[in-house]
Design a protein with these regions (language model features):
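Extended lipid/amphipathic-ligand handling interfaces
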Residues: 162-164, 192-198
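Soluble periplasmic/extracytoplasmic beta-strand elements of cell-envelope proteins
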Residues: 151-152, 159-161, 176, 205
Length: 360
């Protein structure tokens, strides 16, 4: 690593972390001003506000914008270098444009690795503490319940359906269990007006139970006023964790997706997008670094202002495309991988074009 490499890396990282520091301070002030009434109303201890909320708020809010911070930082210090003819001097010394990109790639790869580890492990663990704090003092809500018309496959031969689930008292109304043979044919059906979860026995107590058993063309019917059943289903399984996907580390998130798939639950596409997003965002840092460097390395009459304006447009387009692809993946059947990676795939061609036409 040459002196110029160290110089550029130092400029890159110092500018980046200064931008992060400024944004963090502004974000904390704005968030605190919005939540101070809740904190005072609930008489939240200062220690908990600092250590349980803001200590975990900072990584979460920063991780969302690290790619944009990278783009702005690269454009800012590279544009200054270009205006001071530093980039031109390096090129005149015999270094190629791609050689100048090396320290940029080293620094951005370091940030991408930190972001990758944060997305997959560190931030979700912090979000567990932050969300618990918010549920206790701010929003005061627990997990959102799946209320109406629930259909779950417990295994290949057992399906449970619930007309309405009451989370507050763990009662499932319109409770039914269907059994299937290896050919997928219905062989028995149990229907109850309601089923109440029994914590002591870890079972469901059904009331006004009707059981039908099918054997070819023959059908038998039984009725019970009350009947307990032990199945692989608990009240916690009747919970929609859409707002809690950020609290699960990636291994836990993948495990949850597999469990939901086995149950036959189809509404977990957003979770699959989340898994891919955690890997795509760090790669975005490298892509936007290359774009910012290619744009700002050329000395222009407009100076830093025009470079920052172009960077702002690119950042806005990247965000819009990311939101658009995520929505398509969640609601329109686009594969979750493409939903998370499509902006990177599109903008990598922008990188190729800019680098090929950059100042040599």
């Amino acid at each position: 690593m040459t002196t110029i490499d160290r110089y550029i890396i130092k400029k890159f990282l110092s500018t980046f972390f200064f931008a992060v520091l400024i944004f963090t301070m502004v974000a904390m002030v704005i968030d605190f001003s919005e939540r101070i009434d809740d904190f005072l109303e609930e008489d939240v201890p200062i220690r908990e506000i600092i250590w349980k909320y803001y200590l975990n708020f900072i990584p979460q809010i920063n991780a969302m914008l690290w790619p944009l911070f990278t783009l702005i930082s690269v454009i800012f210090f590279t544009s200054r270098m270009a205006q001071n003819s530093e980039i031109l001097s390096i090129l005149n010394s015999g270094a190629s444009f791609r050689r100048i990109m090396r320290p940029y790639l080293i620094a951005s790869s370091m940030l991408a690795f930190i972001h990758l580890m944060g997305n997959h492990f560190i931030i979700p663990i912090g979000n567990q503490i932050k969300v618990a704090f918010e549920n206790k003092y701010v929003s005061k809500i627990d997990l959102d319940s799946k209320n109406d018309h629930i259909h779950l496959f417990l295994d290949d031969h057992t399906k449970v359906y619930i007309k309405y689930n009451s989370k507050s008292d763990s009662i499932a109304h319109g409770f039914g269990i269907e059994g299937f043979n290896d050919d997928g044919e219905l062989i028995d059906e149990t229907v109850a007006d309601l089923a109440r979860w029994q914590t002591e026995t870890q079972s469901w107590r059904m009331e006004n139970v009707k059981i039908r058993h099918f054997d070819g063309l023959e059908e038998t019917f039984k009725r019970f006023p009350r009947l307990d059943t032990v199945i692989n289903l608990q009240p916690k399984d009747l919970v929609r964790r859409d707002n809690y996907k950020t609290t699960m580390t990636t291994p836990n998130l993948i495990q949850f997706i597999n469990e939901e798939r086995k149950k036959g639950v189809g509404a977990f596409t957003s979770f699959r997008v989340e898994v891919h997003r955690r890997s795509s965002e760090p790669f975005t840092i490298i892509i936007l670094t290359c774009i910012g460097m290619a744009i700002a390395s050329r000395k222009t009459r407009g100076g830093m202002g025009i470079h920052l304006a172009i960077g702002a447009v690119i950042g806005a387009l990247f965000i819009v495309l990311g939101r658009f692809s995520s929505t398509l993946s969640t609601n329109a059947g686009l594969h979750p991988f493409l939903g998370a990676w499509l902006p990177n795939i599109v903008f990598i061609f922008v990188v190729i074009y800019l680098v090929r036409n950059a100042q040599q």
